[in-house]
Every structure is written in structure tokens, then in C-alpha cells.
């Protein structure tokens, strides 16, 4: 199995949840499908969904919610399969 990095498509602030009281989109161990939302990047008060390009299991979350991110920063790592 290979590990796939899901990276930030935009510079901004990364969020693992839709709102402060919502559960996270993903956690370590979560099974995801291609196209699933894994988080949001806020840019100028606009929230942009970040989706997975692959199906698999989340093995690492590389940034915390509300961390600043730049284009290409690794957000999560997914074991494909």
C-alpha cells in the first residue's frame, strides 16, 4: 500500500471541522472515499472544501485545526486501498 499526501490547494487557515461544535471531517483511522471532504481552507472569510483524490485510511493528520497553511502544505496522509 502506498501513502498519498493530501495537500492544501490554497493559502489560508485550515479547519478540520465545519463549525466549532461539529465533529471533525476525518480522524486518524477514518476510512475515506475519493471526493470526500477532509477539511476546509478559509481564505478571506470564504470556506473552501479540501477533498481527497484517493480512497483509503487516514494515517496521519499533519496540521491542527486553525493552523495557517500555504499552497502545497501536506494536510493529511492517506494509505491508499
Q: Predicted regions: what is each one?
A:
Residues 1-40, 55, 81:
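Acidic, low-complexity mobile loops and tails
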Residues 3, 60, 64-65:
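Generic detector of contiguous secondary-structure segments
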Residues 8, 44-48, 69:
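Flexible, active-site-adjacent loop/turn segments at secondary-structure boundaries
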Residues 9, 53, 63, 69:
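Short, acidic, Ser/Thr-enriched surface-loop or helix-capping motifs
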Residues 19, 43, 49-52, 63, ...:
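Short, conserved catalytic or interaction motifs in soluble domains
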Residues 29-38, 43, 66-75:
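A structural signal for short beta-strand/turn segments enriched in small hydrophobics and glycine
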